[in-house]
Amino acid sequence: MAHKTALISGITGQDGSYLAELLLDKGYKVYGVVRRLSAPNVWRIQHLLERITLLQADLLDQLSLIKVVEQSRPDEFYNLAAMSFVPSSWDQPMLTGEFNAQGVTRALEAVRSVNTKIKFYQASSSEMYGRVREVPQTETTPFYPRSPYGVSKVFGHYITVNYRESYGLFACSGILFNHESPRRGIEFVTRKVTDGVARIKLGLADKLMLGNRDACRDWGFAGDYVRAMWMMLQQPEPDDYVVATGEAHSVQELVEVAFAHAGLDWQKHVGVDPKFLRPAEVDHLIGNPQKARQKLGWQPEVAFKGLVTMMVDADLARLSAGQLIP
C-alpha cells in the first residue's frame, strides 16, 4: 500500500506533536504548517524535525493555505491550529474569531479549491457547550458558548458541517473535551498546577495561586485523543464525534492528586487569586464518548490520576534538569 500523506496545521502545539508522532509511526509522510514572520516554537516537535517537513502558511491568509495544500498534496488535512487559550479570547475576541472561525473556512476553501478528495479533520471543543443544556454532553447537545473562544469554535464546527453537506467533502469534527499532557501550555490550569507542584517540591517556589478550584472538567490524555482524530478519517463516512472520558474532576481534585504525588500538603501552599477567575465560567462539562467508542472502537488508555502523576513527574524531571521553560 502506498504511504499516505498528512498535513497538520498547529503541528507545534500539544495535539499536533502527538498526532505527528502517531502518523509517523503509521508510515505517513507528515507535513506541518507553521506561521511565517515568527520563529516557530518547536520544542514539542524538536525530536521529529528530521522526519517531518514544515511549510509556512497562515490561517489568516487564504492563498498561503492553498499553496501548502498544493505543495503537500495530502490525503488527510488535520486543522488543529487555533487560538486555544480561553481567557485570552476575552482580550483578543476579534483575532480569536479570525483564527478559529474564518481560519477554518479558509482551510476548507483550500481543500475545496485544490482537491475535494482530501479528508479534513476540524478540532472542535467542549467549550462550545458552555452553559450546558444537558449532562453529559453528546454530539446532539445544543451549544451555548460562554466565551469568544467558544463562540468561534461553534462557527468552525458548523462551517465544517456545511462544507461536508454542501460540497460532499469528507470533513469531520472531533468535539474534544479537555485533554492534557506534559506538553500542555504552561498557561493551562493542569500544567500550571503540575509545574507549581514541581517548583514547590524543588524549593523554587512556595505558593501556587489559582482561581476557581470548584471548576470541573472532563480531562483526558492528549496522546489518546489524537488517536480518535486519526480514526475518524479512516471511517467509510464522515461524521462528528465527542471525544472524552465521561468523568469529571474538579481543579481541587487535580490539586490534591498532584501535591500528594509529590509528598506535599496542598493546604500549606495553595491560595486564591481573583485575577484568575473567568468573566463567565462554563458549567459541568462531561462528555459522553459512547458514539466514538462504538463506531470508532476508540477507548482512552490513561486515567485521570495517571495523567496528573505523569505531568508532575515530567515537570519534576524538567526542572531538575535546569529547564525552567517551557
Residue ranges and their predicted role:
Residues M1-H179, L233, V302, T309, ...:
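N-terminal Rossmann-like NAD(P)+-binding domain of SDR-like oxidoreductases, especially those catalyzing
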Residues D25, G32-V33, A57-L60, R184-P326:
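C-terminal substrate-binding subdomain of Rossmann-fold SDR/epimerase-dehydratase oxidoreductases
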